[in-house]
A protein has these predicted regions:
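NAD(P)H-binding glycine-rich loop region in Rossmannoid oxidoreductase-like domains
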Residues: 36, 47-86, 94, 112-114
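N-terminal Rossmann NAD(P)H-binding glycine-rich loop of SDR-like oxidoreductase domains
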Residues: 3-23
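Amphipathic terminal alpha-helices
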Residues: 291-298, 302-326
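Conserved C-terminal active-site "lid" loop/helix of NAD(P)H-dependent oxidoreductases
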Residues: 202, 237, 260-301
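Mid/C-terminal beta-alpha module of Rossmann-like enzyme folds, strongest
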Residues: 212-276, 311-315, 321-326
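Catalytic helix-loop patch of NAD(P)-dependent Rossmann-fold dehydrogenases
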Residues: 82, 117-166, 190
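Substrate-positioning beta->alpha
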Residues: 141, 171-177, 191-213, 219-220
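Conserved Rossmann-fold NAD(P)-dependent oxidoreductase catalytic core, especially the SDR/UDP-sugar
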Residues: 90-134
């Protein structure tokens, strides 16, 4: 088959492309930049450009829509709508133009509220979405667009994967930032670290996306997180131990952390610079952000890696020479 991956030069897209290439599929890796790993399969195009999407999808059988605007410091915030909602609409336009009937779409658990309906087990797919930020709102609106598309033709298949924070070699998201701060000795635990986090390793995420090719006609919605969840203290301790340090390191009261975050927010507005610390990042760091991923077991998918395997691999690839005190 010929398979298109929007965001195909990203770290999830690259891992997925490797699995698909191994099976002999032809790829169209659509991104704003050329794939370093698969340059011959790259198509430079912007998901916000409808004509470019239609041209890029010529001859495609299946679309993986991974491209998104997801940073939490985007300005203007309207870019979330432009890229995530408008980009999704353009992908659908391309699917209709070329008679493509299968779309696999990565959404986000940011569509759920910070406080889940089931605090013990986390939000599941039956719970009412209630996004807590502009990013989550845009992903929910994009989901609705794809949900409408799948009902238009009985031959259509939609797999929507609500992803938690995903980490792995090559990623420069929040988990990398945390690891980098720990490795450089600049990290201090905010709060007592008892809050739990649902996270996922890129090797498992790409494996499930690959597995999603086997799902039949209709609409399929899944939360994805690698289990069991870790609390923040255990998570930080695991990273520190992999870097040759003991324990969770220094700690700061939550109220003091919020005050510090507000100072950085003011500085960001005055200077126009982006800082690694903000109120929203501190709140997210200290909150329980867990989801229920039990439903995914119905697909018979088995994650090939444990969370420990994933953390060890990322630290080995990104920080193996780092031995600074923390």
């Amino acid at each position: 088959m010929k398979i298109a991956i929007t965001g195909g030069a990203g770290f999830i897209g690259t891992q997925l492309a490797g699995l698909l290439t191994a099976e002999g599929h032809e790829l169209a890796l659509i991104d704003l930049k050329k794939s370093e790993t698969f340059p011959n399969d790259s198509i430079i195009a912007d998901v916000t450009n409808r004509d470019a999407m239609i041209d890029a999808m010529d001859g495609v059988d299946v679309i993986y829509h991974l491209a998104a605007e997801h940073r939490d410091d985007v300005s203007p915030v309207s870019r979330y709508t432009t890229v995530n909602v408008g980009g999704g609409e353009n992908v659908i336009a391309a699917a209709k133009a070329h008679g493509i009937h299968k779309i696999i779409f990565t959404s986000s658990v940011a569509v759920y509220p910070l406080v889940p309906e089931d605090p013990k087990n986390g939000s599941n797919e039956t719970h009412t979405p209630a996004p807590f930020n502009d990013y989550g709102t845009s992903k929910l609106e994009s989901e609705k667009t794809f949900d409408a598309w799948v009902t238009e033709d009985e031959k259509n298949t939609l797999v929507t994967m609500r992803l938690v924070a995903t980490f792995g070699p090559g990623n420069r998201g929040n988990i990398y930032t945390l690891m980098n701060q720990i490795a450089s000795g600049k990290f201090m635990m905010i709060g007592d670290g008892s809050n739990r986090k649902s996270i996922a390793y890129v090797g498992n995420v790409s494996a499930f996306l690959h597995h999603a090719l086997t799902l039949k006609n209709g609409s399929h919605l899944y939360n994805y997180a690698d289990k069991p969840d870790l609390n923040m203290r255990d998570f930080v301790t695991s990273i520190r131990e992999a870097l040759g340090h003991k324990g969770a390191g220094p700690q700061m009261p939550y109220a003091v952390g919020l005050l510090g975050g507000s100072v950085f927010d003011v500085a960001a507005k005055i200077t126009g610079r982006k800082f690694p610390i903000s109120i929203i990042r501190i709140k997210k760091f200290c909150a329980d952000t867990i989801v229920n991923a039990d439903k995914i077991q119905d697909t018979k998918f088995k994650a090939p890696y444990s969370l420990h395997d994933g953390l060890s691999e990322m630290i080995k690839c990104e920080f193996q020479t780092t031995k600074k005190a923390a």
